[in-house]
Amino acid sequence: MPRSLRAELSKPYGVLFINENKLKQFLINKSNSRLITVGDVVTQTILKFHIKPFLAIVDGKTKRKLVKENFGQFEYIKVKNEPGLIRLSTIREIKDILVHNENDKILMVDGEEDLLVIPVVIYGNFGDIIIYGQPNAGVVVTLNNDFLKRRVLEIFKKFQVTSC
């Protein structure tokens, strides 16, 4: 990821929730949409609400510290994704899950999951609800739509291929 994108990617691309009860109520009202979570704390919070994500992407860490979480009844798929990068193999795994509508999956990332919101937006359906953590602020909830896809594609085009 180019350093020039750090500030851009640290902005929330959706509604920032700081209150768990309001987040829960919002999600209950959107129960017909596919829900995709990116991050360990976000995923654990959603599961605490007895809401099961269609896809959860986690790395076993919170703020770079290891956490021991039990995410329950999911099929676990291990992928590798180094910090600051998005591996093509990981993009393909996310695409396969989202395009083929394969729910109840957890991508367990060896590395870092933060940037994987990007392929989730690109390959997700219009209307998917994507939830990710905003460090030291709360939880961002965004509804996948044409504007978001275009904006994320613009950002993704600025990434550089480092190896093949």
From Swiss-Prot:
Record-listed E.C. numbers: 2.7.1.237
Membrane listed as a keyword: no
Keywords for this protein: Coenzyme A biosynthesis, GTP-binding, Kinase, Nucleotide-binding, Transferase
Any single biological process term in GO: coenzyme A biosynthetic process
Pathway(s) annotated for this protein in UniProt: Cofactor biosynthesis; coenzyme A biosynthesis
UniProt-annotated binding residues for GTP: 40-42, 59, 61, 113
One MF term in the entry's GO annotations: GTP binding
Catalytic activity of the protein: 3'-dephospho-CoA + GTP = GDP + CoA + H(+)
Family recorded in the similarity comment: Belongs to the GTP-dependent DPCK family.
Function, as annotated: Catalyzes the GTP-dependent phosphorylation of the 3'-hydroxyl group of dephosphocoenzyme A to form coenzyme A (CoA).
UniProt name for this protein: GTP-dependent dephospho-CoA kinase
Organism: Sulfolobus acidocaldarius (strain ATCC 33909 / DSM 639 / JCM 8929 / NBRC 15157 / NCIMB 11770)
Lineage of source species: Archaea, Thermoproteota, Thermoprotei, Sulfolobales, Sulfolobaceae
